[in-house]
Amino acid sequence: MKNYLLFEIGVEEMPSRFVGSTLEQLKNNLSKLFDENRIAFDKINAYGTPRRLTLVVEGLSDRQNDLEEEIKGPAKKIAVDAENNLTKPALGFIKSKGLSESDIYFKQVGKEEYIFATIKQDGKETSEVLKDILPETIKSVVFPKAMRWGGKNLKFARPIRWIVALLNDKVLEFDLEGIISSNVTKGHRFLGESTIEVDSIEDYFEKLEKNYIVLDQNKRKEMIRKQCIEVANSLGGEVEFDEDLLEEVTYLVEYPTAFYGEFDVDYIKLPKEVVITPMKQHQRYFPVLKEGKLLPNFIAVRNGDSYRIDNVKAGNEKVLEARLADALFFYREDTKRNLESYIEKLKTVVFQVKLGTIYDKTLRLEKLSADILDSLGLVDEKTDTIRAAKLSKADLVTGMVGEFDELQGFMGKEYAKVGGENDVVSEAIFEHYLPRFAGDILPKTNAGVALSIADKLDSIAGFFAIGIQPTGSQDPYALRRQALGILSILMDRKVAVDIKVLIEHALDNYSELDFDKEEVVEQIMNFFNERVKNLFKDLGIRYDVVDAVLSSDINDVSDMHMRALELNNWLEKDELVEMLTAFNRVSTLAQKAESDKIDESLLKEDAEIKLYNEFKQVKIKVNELLKDKKYGIALDEFASLRPVVDNLFDTVMVMDNDEAIKNNRLALLKQVYDTMLEICDLSKIVYK
């Protein structure tokens, strides 16, 4: 019989940022516990609000699958004495497993015989096992911040106030540190009943709906979206949706009601982002636009119905008014001075104790961004880029950014414009923070590209130079994100630049620090290569393809990407296994070579002479193709050597007894291998 399970954890209001990830953990952890306990099921659905986390399991089996497991005991030589009697180790094994002597047998494993026994265990009723599994599911959830309450040892994001556990229509009663599971849930805190008894899963959903709970977060999100659109339409505008904000608001409410508020039209004169930032970041409101311009309205979502919505509206308007009044004040005060006048104050802001102040960082950015422009061949942009570097951090000490730090970079751009800086300088000040997160926009101007790379690389180089590197899940200075930002920019621009050279330039700006430059360069290169692996994996490129490309000692990420894509496609060719097998043998033997110097007079066999002659022609063609970045065709050309390589291995003993002949053949294979490495290392490709 197929059964269903209803499992609800009732909590005090959880932070919205925790709800989605907690549901995912609960779902995954319960699924894992089902597998470990041999309980079959069809699927698990997860639903959540700020006050409840619910799992609905469909297709549960009646009982565990029976267990039959072969277990291994001590070796026969210590399990049986000279008289063929069982020894203490053997008897101890039998006793510990609840066996009798007749249950054991001996099996050969390698060169030894061992005691074995087959344990059979009948499966328990699912209802019995669930009473252990469900508490464990709750305990297994991990939070960035958790709390204890009421003298309990249990830790959770917020105190657990009730638990519902139903298998079909039967209550699964268990005690989780004084919290007794039942069939009693609660409705909306203000609109619903405080005690709701449920008899089945259908009854549960029906009663929650009657008590103002929209349990399904996807349904709740679409309700919010639809309501916001309707409200915006009534204002003659369009709502500007931010999907992250929409997700957050979804997990802030159990029963959403959207409404609009108004603010003084004078605030519209402020830069758009200055108005939108406190709306979204601080108040969780959605802005309303008409033809791309802000209207003096916002849309908020209430956790409840429309009762006395005017009071709620007035309260929200009052809070936003205070925020916008602060923003207007800071804007007026900040623009009384030009942006350059704030630079001096950067000398008082510490970047990192050993790496100096933010002012020191801007000096390094002026040098490094100029070096990057040289590497990119964009020297005409140098004057504007250096100017942007000088001003890049000045907005950090303005009143506006002090109050709304999300506006860093943007306010620098705005204040630069107000102060008369040209568009290139102004835009670069904003763009140097890009990308700020995964999927963010990338800098478009040359000055912005150079300054963005410089800013991120300066941080990475500095922290590595003083021995601070990301470890495990710890990355307090977001160095991984900054490295991915650099790689994303370089791939987007498709520019040929040696990242190792840029790293060396960045480290040159830290000459006052005591570190081994060669060692730190290697550490940073390894760090970037790990990021390349992650980035390419996200782009759907096989891990072994990435390893093959990285083994070619290429430091140009745009070029790496092109090679990886070409190799990914090339691996679809016929006779792939035969090709890879041949060149794997080349790789293995080539690494035994002491030199790549070939003495033609020592080439005696027809097969090695033919390989040598064909290889010379192929090498010339491959080098020409590499210059034109035709990597797929270069691979085809190199792979054309396979027949003569196979012939060599079939007819010639490479490891000849004559040392000179052996070394000469190894040198030939090394040259073949080195040419392969000019494209990629095919020996890294995994095949069946």
Curated annotation (Swiss-Prot):
Residues passing through the membrane, by range: none
EC number in record: 6.1.1.14
Originating gene: glyS
The keyword Protein biosynthesis appears for this protein: yes
Cellular localisation: Cytoplasm
GO MF entry, a single one: glycine-tRNA ligase activity
Classification via PANTHER family: GLYCINE--TRNA LIGASE, CHLOROPLASTIC_MITOCHONDRIAL 2, GLYCYL-TRNA SYNTHETASE
UniProt enzyme class: ligase
Entry-linked InterPro entries: DALR_anticod-bd (IPR008909), Gly-tRNA-synth_bsu (IPR015944), Gly-tRNA-synth_heterodimer (IPR006194)
GO CC aspect terms: cytosol
Entry-linked HAMAP family: Gly_tRNA_synth_beta
A Pfam entry, by short name: tRNA_synt_2f
Cystine pairs: none
Organism: Clostridioides difficile (strain 630) (Peptoclostridium difficile)
Record key words, sorted: Aminoacyl-tRNA synthetase, ATP-binding, Cytoplasm, Ligase, Nucleotide-binding, Protein biosynthesis
Family note: Belongs to the class-II aminoacyl-tRNA synthetase family.
Name the UniProt record assigns to this protein: Glycine--tRNA ligase beta subunit
The keyword Cell division is annotated on this UniProt entry: no
Subunit structure: Tetramer of two alpha and two beta subunits.
Biological processes annotated in GO: arginyl-tRNA aminoacylation; glycyl-tRNA aminoacylation
Catalyzed reactions per annotation: tRNA(Gly) + glycine + ATP = glycyl-tRNA(Gly) + AMP + diphosphate
